[in-house]
Amino acid sequence: RMVELIKRGEPAVMLCHWPGMYTQGTKKGFTAFKRVVETLNSRFGDQTIWMKLSEIGRYWTAKELTRITFADRKISLNAPFGAPKFTVRVPGVVATNSPPRFIVENQTVALQGVTETRLLRSGTWHADSKGLVMCFDLPKGVSQIQW
């Protein structure tokens, strides 16, 4: 099922319980888990982001509760929770001559362009046939992206 979810670009979550990992001291469950992780990394490493459960919870809480408004080459975000490596896609937007700018409390930071979506890290952006993708550390409160 993990492979199906990853191929479709959907979130795929594995949850392991410590008793099952250690299998009464034999660590057979842990060995099996490591094998699954290695296999997924070898096949889907470019499209997989490993996160702890707390990181998933923070990201999805920010995703669901952040108010996002679009207006003329600008996105305004009002986030009740911050989230590192927050990613926004703006469909249909093509690359511009100047990089997108991330603005928080009157401080502006130009995002750095990357050549492929898989290279996105916090503070970067990429334009592809689907639009503009930007990744940044979303702060609690109000912020903007302009391009």
Report each predicted region and the residues it spans.
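C-terminal beta-sandwich/jelly-roll accessory domains of carbohydrate-active enzymes
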Residues: 63-147
